[in-house]
Amino acid sequence: FVNYITDDGYIYVRRNGGSDVMIAPSMRVNVHTDKGIVKGVFGYPAIHVRDTAKDEAPNLKTIFIDCGAKNKDELAEMGIHVGCVVTFVDEFMLLNDRFYVGRALDNRIGGYMIAQ
């Protein structure tokens, strides 16, 4: 979920669910708004601007979402506000013509089995 928006248009989130923060940098996301989906990408400070003495792993305080907005007001015009849901862009696929891969596939199959 969108938790905080900076004056210069970067979005910080709260985690909901089992996503690992370590995989977030460079991942594409969908921000779900009342106006529709807004595309974004998780950013992480570049290696040449990080303090290498305390080079820490990505965490919710160091990663952010960039939707290409120049400031907070432009994000608001896109419909983005605190509380908007953010999801990874993902696709269902078949590996080696035998294995199904997809986000939360285990939960979805489990839900289907319970419903049956």
Predicted regions and their residues:
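N-terminal hydrophobic/helix-forming segments and targeting peptides
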Residues: 1-116
